[in-house]
Structure formats: structure tokens, C-alpha cells
Amino acid sequence: MPCGEDWLSHPLGIVQGFFAQNGVNPDWEKKVIEYFKEKLKENNAPKWVPSLNEVPLHYLKPNSFVKFRCMIQDMFDPEFYMGVYETVNQNTKAHVLHFGKYRDVAECGPQQELDLNSPRNTTLERQTFYCVPVPGESTWVKEAYVNANQARVSPSTSYTPSRHKRSYEDDDDMDLQPNKQKDQHAGARQAGSVGGLQWCGEPKRLETEASTGQQLNSLNLSSPFDLNFPLPGEKGPACLVKVYEDWDCFKVNDILELYGILSVDPVLSILNNDERDASALLDPMECTDTAEEQRVHSPPASLVPRIHVILAQKLQHINPLLPACLNKEESKTCKFVSSFMSELSPVRAELLGFLTHALLGDSLAAEYLILHLISTVYTRRDVLPLGKFTVNLSGCPRNSTFTEHLYRIIQHLVPASFRLQMTIENMNHLKFIPHKDYTANRLVSGLLQLPSNTSLVIDETLLEQGQLDTPGVHNVTALSNLITWQKVDYDFSYHQMEFPCNINVFITSEGRSLLPADCQIHLQPQLIPPNMEEYMNSLLSAVLPSVLNKFRIYLTLLRFLEYSISDEITKAVEDDFVEMRKNDPQSITADDLHQLLVVARCLSLSAGQTTLSRERWLRAKQLESLRRTRLQQQKCVNGNEL
């Protein structure tokens, strides 16, 4: 069995060792998974695995062991592949069994040929996910992962920087002149496809249903390949992820950490184009029908590498400062949580002061911003999401950079965020809702395809008079549904499919927001800096990195604390609410009680308390009273509704 760092540089050799020992006995697959699982438990082993998020693709060796932090953007149809196949040596007639798992290209000797009629060939199924880097991931998160990674990599001799930078058009240019490439793979790498597994053998073609493709000249070579990122300006690799076990556990928009084998073999581009040419000759009509689908589902490996997953973990969060799984009863995790909780009070006080300065001296608005940032949908009762707390910060100065810089502050605190500038042009032209493209058989992303716990900051101060067209109205409706029901209805043309979500929405506006919000707090600045950018920059630079990290841990950790209300406090709250209704029957409603309970929940958690106390309930009532009084005062000043 290979040892040392072979599991990192030559994982297929490890797999081959288990396969050779066990043959067709399926136990070898479990042993492979167990082997890599144990390897990753060794001291700091995950930090030695090169990450596609941090390491340029051209620095990674093909067929090496890699990891990838990503979101499932789409799920393709399951595909069949040859789990075990047999080859025959043309000279000696010797038969050899090979495994097809974790491979796109079957490696055969120059004298070997695939025996399609072998009774020992087995066809298995695997699932393909289209995965993209986590949308809106903050710069500080990326930097922390980069600094933690200890993988030693250098430019791959078989994968040069020029390949990495080549566009989709260049890939097709290469494929239009395949002789230069094919000469490198002559004999041992003649193209073929059986059951989803590309294979090499003698120079002859084998066509199956899986290889029915497209005409090369039907491609739109003038436009670059669309990596289908949900948010504009996103960078990083998209990957086709091949999953072999337990794929039913995952769903679209899940955040995953994957460990697997990288496949970037240039021969994949040659094979795909050969299949297009061959299928065009066999059935031009069928080829035309599937051209776009073939382009999307089989992009050049230099642009969209493949990862054959050995281990996959669904991530609760992407904050690199915390243990990956906070629900585990591991001593290390418990020790981390208890240690941080013991110093929670000063961290909260410092964070409140920091946000008070960011909100121009308004400590009440800072309190509500903290409550908003730690809120989360903890459960659903029928269609009602419980725990969400959308805040509308009204009174923001118009034609000012305040909202832009406030978003920068939030970016420095949360792991993932996006600022939506709510202009008429953006509302009318941006794609908010993901939709199904049946021609390409893929889910085309939209701005609202975001993973759980993303902070979405909607800036209404940029909104001017204008006309919303039909797409604009649909986009406003989508935002309203997201805020109210924490769901996005994806467009599948013939029907809509509901995707539940857990997005923290924070709205900045001059007057009352056009969108529904759980809570409106009117900003009362205590100071107006002459230079907003200079003020906010000095605020950020004054905070020590260690303190900033404590803020980040605080805001992520508190979302995952269990919370409950005792029977005694429940009875006290009910009695209190009845008394409030007696005193003010017109303005106190059941919705007000619900909001008070949400505020009390977040307030308790912000103090590290996992159960509601009488003291926190009274403090929640006090905060709500101050907020309502402020709104009434502002309404009297303006003479209109806020």
C-alpha cells in the first residue's frame, strides 16, 4: 500500500491498492472512504490538502487529492459509468480488471483494449452537482482560509498557467486543431465513451447513448462560457462534482466542503468534441437538439474542472474562526464554545460601541442591528418561518455614502453578504429569480440564489422616481416573498418550485421601506462627519484584528445556540400581554406579541442566555417602547407616515 504523501499526490494509487486486494468485492469502496477519513483526522491533515478556493488551478496536479468549499448551484441528471471494466492485451490475451470509480478517463496500456462483452463489467450510477464558490463570501473569510492552508504546491508540469488563462473560445480553437493534442495521446489515449466513462484503447470509435452530442459549429464561439455564478463580479472556479454515495442527503444551495480527486485531463475536451462530430454524422437532428445541453454539461476541463468526491461534508457555516460543526459533542468544540461564552459580556459591549459609532452615535439602532445580525430561522410552523428578523433602518441620509460604508462595516463582520442597490434600472434588468433553461437542461442562477445565513443588504436610498416594468414588479414581489416567507419561487416555466431559505435582510432607506419588514428603526444621528469615508475608515482601523475576530465569532456562534422558554416565563408573558391589551387594545396585536418574543429571543442570545428570563423580557419591552416612541416623534415632525 502506498504511504507518506501518496494519499495527497497519488490518491488513485491508494484506490488501486484496495481494489487489487478486494477485486469485485464492494468492500473495497468502503475501505477507501475509511482510509481517507482516518487520514484527515490526523493532526492538521485538512490544512495540507490543496484547496481549489485558494490555489490556482494550474498549480494543482491532475488526479491529486484536493478540497473545495462551495455551494451546490445545480444538480444534473444522474449518469451511468463503468464501475468495473475488463481489458484484453492484444499480444498476450491477458485479461485485467480495472475500477472506473473516481475517473473520467480510463487508463489502458497501448496494447490493451476494452472488452465490452465481458460478464465482469459492471455499470453503476453517480450524481453530478454543478458547484460554485460560496456567493458573497467575505474577503476576511477567504484570507483566513488562505492563511490557514499549509499545502505545498507548485505549477504543474502537465497543466500550465497559459491553459488556466485560456478562454472558452481558445479551448474550441485547440479542439478545432486536434492533431497537435492528439499526437500526445496516440495509442494509449484514443477517444471513446462507454457508460459515462471515457476510455482509451485502439484507434476506433464506440458510440453509445451517453456520447450523443452536438455539432461543433453550432456553438456560440463568440461568447465566453457562462460559469453561472448567482452574484455579479464573483471569482473562483466552478466545478462539476461527481458524487458516488449518499447524494440524496444534499440539496441545491447547500454549502459543502468536498474532498476528492481532481480531474482536469485535457483529453476530456478532445473527447467531447469528437463525440459532437460523430453524433452529428449519426443523427444531425438529435445533435442539434442537445447542442446547448452538451456545451453546458461538458465544458472544457480547463475552465470547469471535475472533482470525484471521496468525502463530502455539509457545512453549518463558513466562518473559519469557529469549529466546522458546532452541534458535535466533541471536547474540543465544547471547550471552544464554553471558553468564548465566558467572555461574552465584554465582547457584546465592545460590539455595541463599535456599531454605535458606525451608526453615527445611535446606540438604539446599534442594539437592533446586533439583534438582526444574530437572528436566524430556527424552525418553520406550517409556512411561517420563526426567528427571522428583517430590520428597516429608515432616516438614512440621501445622496450620501453612509449606506455604502455601513455595508462595508457589515461585510467585515459576517462571513457572506451582498448589497443590492435598489435602483429602477437594477430592479427592471437584474435577474433575481433562478429559472430552468430546458434547452441547456440547467438551472440558470439569479441574485436570490443564496446559501443560508447570507446577509442581504438592500439599499433603497438610491431609489428614484420611475416606472417598474413587468420584470421589475416580479423582482419586487420576489424580495417581498423572501422577507415575509423566507422562500424563493424558482421559475420552471410550467410551474414554480418553492425553495425555502434563511437570508438575513437588512433594508436601508430614507423614509419607510417599500418592502415589508419585521421592524423599523429610525436613525437618529448624534454626529454628522464632514468626510464619511474618512470617518468609517478610521473606525475600522481603530479596531484591533483580535477584537474584530471576536465580533465575528460572536455573531456566528450565537445563531446556533439552543433556546427555550420555561413554562413559568411563558405564563408570565401571557399575563403581561393580556395586561398590555387592556391598557392599549387598539395598538397592541398578536403580531406585536410575536415580534416582542423574537426581540426577547435575540436579546437573550446576545447576552449568552439560552432561556428567557424576566429581566430580558422587560428589556425587550423597553427597547420596543423606545423604538415606537421614536417613530411616533418622527411621524409628528414629518407629518406623514414613515
UniProtKB/Swiss-Prot annotation:
Its main location: nucleus. Keywords: Cell cycle, Cell division, DNA replication, Mitosis, Nucleus, Phosphoprotein. It is found in: Nucleus. Pfam families: MCM_bind (PF09739). Residues 151-197 are annotated as: Disordered. The modification Phosphothreonine is found at T160. One of its GO terms (molecular function) is chromatin binding. Coiled coil: none annotated. InterPro entries: MCM_complex-bd. The modification Phosphoserine is found at S154, S167, S298. Residues 151-161 have a biased composition (Polar residues). One of its GO terms (biological process) is cell division. GO terms for cellular component: cell junction; cytosol; nucleoplasm; nucleus. Interacts with the MCM complex: associates with the MCM3-7 complex which lacks MCM2, while it does not interact with the MCM complex when MCM2 is present (MCM2-7 complex). Interacts with the RPA complex, when composed of all RPA1, RPA2 and RPA3 components, but not with RPA1 or RPA2 alone. Associated component of the MCM complex that acts as a regulator of DNA replication. Binds to the MCM complex during late S phase and promotes the disassembly of the MCM complex from chromatin, thereby acting as a key regulator of pre-replication complex (pre-RC) unloading from replicated DNA. Can dissociate the MCM complex without addition of ATP; probably acts by destabilizing interactions of each individual subunits of the MCM complex. Required for sister chromatid cohesion. Belongs to the MCMBP family. This is Mini-chromosome maintenance complex-binding protein. It comes from Homo sapiens (Human). The lineage of its organism: Eukaryota, Metazoa, Chordata, Craniata, Vertebrata. The gene is MCMBP.
